[in-house]
């Protein structure tokens, strides 16, 4: 019998001190953000210190997280800013991304 517990995966966007947006994936957003704050996260956030989490998406598995992360990272800065600007835009993005990527975003 397989008793593996299915991990939740998250895609998160962080605002950095230089006003840029960093996108990453994790199973624990709080822990990962703390790593970024302490300079133990990605090279990107070591240089561009994180100041806040802008948004978080929950997905079903690692594969879905990777697909969504890649998709977001390929958006323009303007598109990313629109995405995080309000809940309506986020919901519209979720609907579009679910259809385009064939994944479920919670």
Per-region residue spans from a language model:
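A structural signal for short, well-ordered beta-strand elements
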Residues: 25, 58-60, 73
């Amino acid at each position: 019998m397989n008793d593996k517990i299915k991990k939740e995966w998250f895609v998160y966007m962080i605002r950095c001190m230089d006003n840029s947006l960093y996108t990453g994936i994790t199973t624990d957003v709080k822990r990962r953000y703390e790593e970024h704050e302490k300079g133990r996260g990605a090279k990107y956030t070591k240089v561009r210190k994180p100041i806040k989490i802008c948004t978080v998406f929950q997905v079903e598995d690692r594969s879905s997280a990777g697909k969504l992360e890649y998709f977001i990272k390929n958006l323009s800065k303007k598109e990313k800013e629109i995405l995080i600007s309000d809940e309506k835009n986020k919901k519209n993005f979720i609907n579009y991304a679910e259809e385009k990527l064939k994944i479920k975003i919670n």
